[in-house]
Amino acid sequence: MATEEDVKQRQIIESRARNISHNVRCTECGSQSIEDSQADIAILLRKLIRDEIKSGKSDKEIYKKLQADYGETILYTPKFDLQTAAIWLSPVIVGGVAAGVWAYKKHRQRTNVHIMALNLVRGVPLTPREKETMLDVLTPPPPANKWWWPGK
């Protein structure tokens, strides 16, 4: 007969095995954890996890062994390193650079007209009203198309 301590020990092993199995991807099914899959490899991996727990290994050691044997994609939570950060942050960086280039071109286009107009009349004595009129005449009208995309 199993003692109460044996039953508790089996329950602890079972709960640890289930917890680890929920975080390990089935290599055949792809989208299922090995806990939910009935593929042969999933059954084999569940048995391997239970055997490793019974031999006294920690969860971290089991995850490392699985990752070493089957690659990083077997785990649902891949490690966060420089390459992963670059992959996740690259769209934000590209968007920021594109917005910066757009804003720079927009600002540069607006300021160049005023600089050119002021350089045109450098040394010519003009009243402030005449300067304002000259800038109004030389400044191109805003585009009729208010959309950022030319086709709209």
From Swiss-Prot:
Keyword field: Cytochrome c-type biogenesis, Heme, Iron, Membrane, Metal-binding, Mitochondrion, Mitochondrion inner membrane, Transmembrane, Transmembrane helix
Gene Ontology cellular component list: mitochondrial inner membrane; protein-containing complex
Topological category with respect to the lipid bilayer: Single-pass membrane protein
Protein name (Swiss-Prot/TrEMBL): Cytochrome c-type biogenesis CcmH-like mitochondrial protein
Lineage of the species this protein comes from: Eukaryota, Viridiplantae, Streptophyta, Embryophyta, Tracheophyta
Superkingdom assignment: Eukaryota
Keyword Translocase: no
Function: Plays a role in mitochondrial cytochrome c maturation. Probable component of a heme lyase complex involved in the reduction of apocytochrome c.
Binding site for heme: 26, 29
GO biological process terms on file: cytochrome complex assembly; embryo development ending in seed dormancy
UniProt source species: Oryza sativa subsp. indica
Mitochondrial intermembrane side: 1-83
Pfam families: CcmH
Family to which this protein belongs: Belongs to the CcmH/CycL/Ccl2/NrfF family.
Mitochondrial matrix side: 105-152
The keyword NAD appears for this protein: no
Residues passing through the membrane, by range: 84-104
UniProt main location, coarse: mitochondrion
MF-aspect GO terms: metal ion binding; oxidoreductase activity
InterPro entries membership: CcmH/CycL/Ccl2/NrfF_N, CcmH/CycL/NrfF/Ccl2_sf
Compartments where located: Mitochondrion inner membrane
